[in-house]
From Swiss-Prot:
The lineage of its organism: Bacteria, Bacillati, Bacillota, Bacilli, Bacillales. It is a peripheral membrane protein. It catalyses: di-trans,octa-cis-undecaprenyl diphospho-N-acetyl-alpha-D-muramoyl-L-alanyl-D-glutamyl-meso-2,6-diaminopimeloyl-D-alanyl-D-alanine + UDP-N-acetyl-alpha-D-glucosamine = di-trans,octa-cis-undecaprenyl diphospho-[N-acetyl-alpha-D-glucosaminyl-(1->4)]-N-acetyl-alpha-D-muramoyl-L-alanyl-D-glutamyl-meso-2,6-diaminopimeloyl-D-alanyl-D-alanine + UDP + H(+). UDP-N-acetyl-alpha-D-glucosamine binds at T10, G11, G12, N124, S195, I250, Q295. The keyword Glycoprotein does not apply. HAMAP family: MurG. One of its GO terms (molecular function) is UDP-N-acetyl-D-glucosamine:N-acetylmuramoyl-L-alanyl-D-glutamyl-meso-2,6-diaminopimelyl-D-alanyl-D-alanine-diphosphoundecaprenol 4-beta-N-acetylglucosaminlytransferase activity. Pathway: Cell wall biogenesis; peptidoglycan biosynthesis. It is found in: Cell membrane. Its main location: membrane. This is UDP-N-acetylglucosamine--N-acetylmuramyl-(pentapeptide) pyrophosphoryl-undecaprenol N-acetylglucosamine transferase. Keywords: Cell cycle, Cell division, Cell membrane, Cell shape, Cell wall biogenesis/degradation, Glycosyltransferase, Membrane, Peptidoglycan synthesis, Transferase.
Length: 363
């Protein structure tokens, strides 16, 4: 079996693709894979480090508003589709999968024109422009949020969830908190704003750290590499207790997620898939700097089901973050209710469901 996969730009498109590849390898160890992305995207480094064959095309994204740049993008799309056809003819895949981001546009389009079975995976509650366009040509559209179903033809939709969810379930958390100077078994809050951190989240947390010194529950505060040194210097005079650990980055996130009680974070699709698969309650601060405000829409889906509390970045200045954390951790009934609600939304079998959908369209 030969499988071509394309998706990129951000980790939210790349990591689900890699999770799918790993799941496919379990049942089809003989399978061959080819990843098609861009050299400038996050995918180039990540995929190559995984040892997966990689081919690059050149493409840029469409602007949502009218722009002369879109004319250039159309030309790049056509050129990318032409190169994709050649790559696919040489590789001869049995199926082509797109996991989002503009790079998968010409790849999946070319595959459809070559009559190769195709599937796209939409991680968010708001459909991306590329996936909206491709859905006219693909055989199946795999989704993670019911809210996005109106964007696609109902006969093509299959609800799978995000395959990254499957990779955090059952991970051994022994020693996870100790690695960061904390104690296992104590209520612990994880705060992070994505791989690079988020200034708005950091400012809100810094404002309540003096209060946190007086709390019994632990804090694992991940600032992001970019912000770490500045924040570390500003906290030097606070004499933070041993129950507060400030880190630039977390490399073993699946282990940590299995060890914490509550998460304060952005609302990226992959993060929410992981939290719900594990049944971890959350306080979500959606990034306002994303396309079509999709993070807030993602977060509201959890809020509607009592799995999270949502605070927009605009609301942060007038919201007592410490009081919000207290309202959850000091109310066992509320904490347990949010855990149960998050767990009910989770799709720990998402990777297997997505593989099932892929195999169903293969000739």
């Amino acid at each position: 079996m030969k499988v071509a996969i394309s998706g990129g730009g951000t980790g939210g498109h790349v990591y689900p693709a890699l999770a799918l590849i790993r799941e496919l390898k379990k049942s089809h160890p003989e399978a061959e894979f080819l990843y098609i992305g861009t050299e400038k995207g996050l995918e180039a480094g990540i995929v190559k480090r995984e040892g997966i064959p990689f081919e690059a095309i050149e493409i840029t994204g469409f602007k949502r508003s009218l722009s002369l740049e879109n004319i250039k993008t159309v030309m790049r799309f056509l050129s990318g589709a032409k190169k994709s056809k050649q790559i696919l003819r040489d590789f001869k895949p049995d199926v082509v999968i797109g996991t989002g981001g503009y790079v998968c546009g010409p790849v999946v389009y070319a595959a459809a024109k070559l009559k190769i079975p195709t599937l796209i995976h939409e991680q968010n509650s708001v459909a991306g422009l590329t996936n909206k366009f491709l859905s006219r040509y693909t055989d199946k559209v795999a989704i993670c949020f019911e809210e996005v179903s109106d964007s696609f033809a109902s006969e093509k939709i299959v609800f799978t969830g995000n395959p990254r969810a499957s990779e955090v379930v059952g991970v051994d958390s022994e020693g996870a908190l100790e690695a960061y100077g904390l104690v296992s078994g104590k209520p612990t809050v994880l705060v992070f704003g994505g791989s690079r951190g988020a200034r708005g989240v950091n400012e809100a947390v810094e404002a309540v750290l003096p209060e946190w010194n007086n709390r019994d529950f632990q804090l694992l505060y991940v600032t992001g590499d970019v912000h770490y040194e500045k924040i570390k210097d500003s906290l030097a005079e606070l004499n933070l207790g041993n129950h507060i650990s400030v880190q630039p980055f977390i490399y073993d996130m699946p282990k940590i997620l299995n060890a914490v009680t509550l998460v304060v974070s952005r609302a990226g699709a992959t993060t929410l898939a992981e939290l719900t698969a594990l049944g971890v309650p959350s306080i979500l601060i959606p990034s306002p700097y994303v396309t079509a405000n999709h993070q807030e829409n993602n977060a509201r889906a959890l809020e509607k089901n009592n799995a999270a509390i949502v605070i927009t970045e605009a609301e942060l200045k007038n919201t007592d973050l410490m009081a919000t954390v207290d309202s959850i951790l000091n109310d066992e009934a509320k904490l347990n209710s949010m855990k149960l609600s998050a767990k009910q939304m989770g799709r720990p079998d998402a990777a297997a469901k997505l593989v099932e959908a892929v195999l169903s369209i293969m000739k």
